[in-house]
Amino acid sequence: MTWLSEKVGDAVSVDGVFKDVQNLGNSGYFSEVNPVFTSVPEGVKIDFAVVTNPVVHGVVFEGNSVYTSDVLTKYMAIPEGQIMNSVYVGQKVQGINAAYARDGYMLAHVDGIAVDGNGMIHIHIVEGIVEDIVPAGNKKTRNKVITREFVQKTGKPFNKFLVRRSVERVYNLGFFDDVNVRMLPGEKDPNNVIIEIDVLEHKTGTITLGAGYSKSDGLMGIVEFGEDNLRGT
């Protein structure tokens, strides 16, 4: 077996046995590998007690809403009727994570893999749901004025492209000098996210001072005050 470096007639090496255990584990076909040493007249006999992974009979996806299970199945492409190879499954899972990231769902990822007694592989996905959108730093502008510009919606998976467009829409209102986003852990679920939209309102008030003169009123002052973002509407 090519996974084993220890040969009959060789002196037993702890490092060699450890390497063989690693090689067997890294093959992907076994969930457990344990060396068993037995004394024999010729020296020491080494057996490797292994627990073989189950035969695959199908894949079930849980927690996915962005992509259908049919789409995700194409990414997995795990042959049925064969022993599950955990290394191969791990590589395919990375393909799913990459697909989410490519489309802007930067918080989505495969969170767990389990195999039931029927040989069904359960792939659990968390998609980073937006729990809430909370404005901050706005003293004159109402919250709804900010949140209504968001194309990223609560209850939906976080998408960096939608958030970027939302920030641009808020900035284009013309009320703010700066608009930034902070992501906070969800309160209902740690896999969720709360978006804090932090704004810096610019000084919209203008004051004009002047003086004039009329024969009837004499010297008079002129004071004008203007407010662009009146009542934050």
Where do the language-model regions lie?
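Periplasmic polypeptide-binding modules associated with outer-membrane biogenesis and secretion
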Residues: 1-227
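Short loop/turn motifs that connect adjacent beta-strands in outer-membrane beta-barrel proteins
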Residues: 230-233
